[in-house]
Amino acid sequence: MPEIVNIISREIVDSRGNPTVESEVHTKSGFFGLASVPSGSSLGSQEALELRDNDHARFFGKGVKKSVNIINSTIRVSLLNIDVTKQSVIDEIMINLDGTNNKSQLGANSILSVSLAIAKAAASFMGMPLYQYIARLYGMSSNVYSMPVPMMNIMNGGKHADNNLDIQEFMIVPVGAKNIKQAIQMGSEISYSLKNVLNNLGISIALGDEGGYAPNLKSHSYALELINKSIEQSNYVLGKDVVLAIDCAASELFEVSTGKYVINSEKVSFTSEEFVDYLSSLARKYCIFSIEDGQSEHDWHGFSYLTKKLGDIMQLVGDDLFVTNPNLLKMGINKNVANSILVKPNQIGSLTETLNVIKLAKESGYSTIVSHRSGETEDTSIADIAVGTSAGQIKTGPVRCSERTSKYNRLIRIEEFLKDNSKFYGVNEIKNLSAQLWMYQNKNMNI
């Protein structure tokens, strides 16, 4: 029988050495699910609360014993003997048990670890892979799954690194690949080429939190030039095989007192409109098709201007802006702000809510990108979520560090298993990509 007979939680460590939560769910019939949750460093102010101990005698206050104890007592007792296949019912029980808007009583980390473990136990009970079970929960009718195109963060800055770059992520996107396996190969080759480019210039190859290189460079343009050079040295073509994407994490750059965006590495500051012009110039020159958090989460006027200026030719992603929250996404839809959402399950705190946000975004014409966090674990749930919802895109770092490659390896296995029942999202299906490619190819024209 699929009734829950036990839930066990423990404190483990993530890729930064910080504690996080892992949970097991066991059923009467002997099936079980195991899941752990990640943690971010650059946080949106309205993310669901990650419960920490704040006991500075352990892990500088970052321990999660409170969360573990809540799962092993309160949550466990509330879910015993419930059918493990009742995902939405179980998630609702935990959300109501918490009783707050931001999950501050039980903690989003507590609820999500159990929520994902529930799904894995249910998938095991039903004899299907997790992505197929998620597709069933999501209501996907097609038997053909879209494999997500990876957005690979190969150079880190901002809060993800101890260097001088203000832009937080510089990503390569292998849109010209035929399948996920080739996309991963391209990402690996370009990353190694970038290492050689940096080495030959005597530039540090130290790594940031997400495994990308974290050099000190004279400007963001120079960073993009080096990435372009690494693409060329890998025998790929920018604007054909590969395009670029950036995460500005602009909330970290926004100076509230002046209302300006401060780029310390280039010793300049911009108004909202000037920052849009700056980003537009970079995009046109370096074939950047996607800009994440190109304005502060508090600067809705700036985000509206960004969307008005670039929304028809680029993918404009809301991360801190939306924090995987349906109410904030609805506000963005109503105000015509951004055209894409980054989906981080731990920002909202349950699988059911995550799937509902993806559905809302897609129904509203927003593209969806399922994403990791800077502090990751070996859990591969986001790969299954990306496939099970045919999200289209995934962010899970460079092809380096096992907490990142575990997701890539999971995608390789899924694609191999699905064979003809999968298609790679690729160049023809990404929002506004064709328009951006045209702009890049005609960048010298006066248009």
From Swiss-Prot:
User: At which positions is (2R)-2-phosphoglycerate bound?
Assistant: Q168, K344, R373, S374, K395
| Record's subcellular location | Cytoplasm; Secreted; Cell surface
Single GO biological process annotation from the record: glycolytic process
* SUPFAM superfamilies listed in its UniProt record: Enolase C-terminal domain-like, Enolase N-terminal domain-like
Q: How does it assemble?
A: Component of the RNA degradosome, a multiprotein complex involved in RNA processing and mRNA degradation.
Biological function: Catalyzes the reversible conversion of 2-phosphoglycerate (2-PG) into phosphoenolpyruvate (PEP). It is essential for the degradation of carbohydrates via glycolysis.
Q: Which family does it belong to?
A: Belongs to the enolase family.
From the Swiss-Prot or TrEMBL record, give the protein name.
Answer: Enolase
Supply the source organism for this entry.
Answer: Blochmanniella floridana
Phylogenetic lineage: Bacteria, Pseudomonadati, Pseudomonadota, Gammaproteobacteria, Enterobacterales
